[in-house]
UniProtKB/Swiss-Prot annotation:
<dbReference type="GO" id="GO:0005576">
    <property type="term" value="C:extracellular region"/>
</dbReference>
<dbReference type="GO" id="GO:0050830">
    <property type="term" value="P:defense response to Gram-positive bacterium"/>
</dbReference>
<feature type="disulfide bond">
    <location>
        <begin position="94"/>
        <end position="111"/>
    </location>
</feature>
<feature type="modified residue" description="Pyrrolidone carboxylic acid">
    <location>
        <position position="1"/>
    </location>
</feature>
<dbReference type="InterPro" id="IPR023412">
    <property type="entry name" value="RNaseA_domain"/>
</dbReference>
<keyword id="KW-1015">Disulfide bond</keyword>
<feature type="active site" description="Proton donor">
    <location>
        <position position="104"/>
    </location>
</feature>
<protein>
    <recommendedName>
        <fullName>Ribonuclease, liver</fullName>
        <ecNumber>4.6.1.18</ecNumber>
    </recommendedName>
</protein>
<feature type="binding site">
    <location>
        <position position="60"/>
    </location>
    <ligand>
        <name>substrate</name>
    </ligand>
</feature>
<feature type="disulfide bond">
    <location>
        <begin position="34"/>
        <end position="82"/>
    </location>
</feature>
<dbReference type="GO" id="GO:0016829">
    <property type="term" value="F:lyase activity"/>
</dbReference>
<dbReference type="GO" id="GO:0003676">
    <property type="term" value="F:nucleic acid binding"/>
</dbReference>
<dbReference type="InterPro" id="IPR036816">
    <property type="entry name" value="RNaseA-like_dom_sf"/>
</dbReference>
<feature type="active site" description="Proton acceptor">
    <location>
        <position position="10"/>
    </location>
</feature>
<dbReference type="InterPro" id="IPR023411">
    <property type="entry name" value="RNaseA_AS"/>
</dbReference>
<keyword id="KW-0255">Endonuclease</keyword>
<keyword id="KW-0873">Pyrrolidone carboxylic acid</keyword>
Length: 111
């Protein structure tokens, strides 16, 4: 995965996320099945990129500040469209950095 895909999958400028609509997009369908969960970072691209600024070599990095988050969690295994519910949070995030850019969302709160 690269920075462009990471942005598309995880960064949003607004916290008003309709999980049921957004999670039915092709990028969240894995092997023909609905993805179990996806975390959205409510922030500017520059703030998220800053996590990897100066990080060398490529590695996982924990943000020094907390981000507003919204995780869409699948309620049940059903045919598409799958039902999801939002789980808001405010926490540090761990991302995988490559060439000083976030390319993979690792987790919330720790690496």
């Amino acid at each position: 995965q690269n920075w462009a895909k990471f942005k598309e999958k995880h960064i949003r400028s607004t916290s008003s996320i309709d999980c049921n609509t957004i999670m039915d997009k092709a990028i969240y369908i894995v092997g023909g099945k609905c993805k179990e969960r996806n975390t959205f970072i409510i922030s500017s691209e520059d703030n998220v990129k800053a996590i990897c600024s100066g990080v060398s070599p490529d590695r996982k990095e924990l943000s020094t500040t907390s981000f507003k988050l919204n995780t869409c969690i699948r309620d049940s295994i059903t045919p598409r469209p799958c039902p999801y519910h939002p789980s808001p949070d405010n926490n540090k995030i761990c991302v995988k950095c490559e060439k000083q850019l976030p390319v993979h969302f690792v987790g919330i709160g720790k690496c």
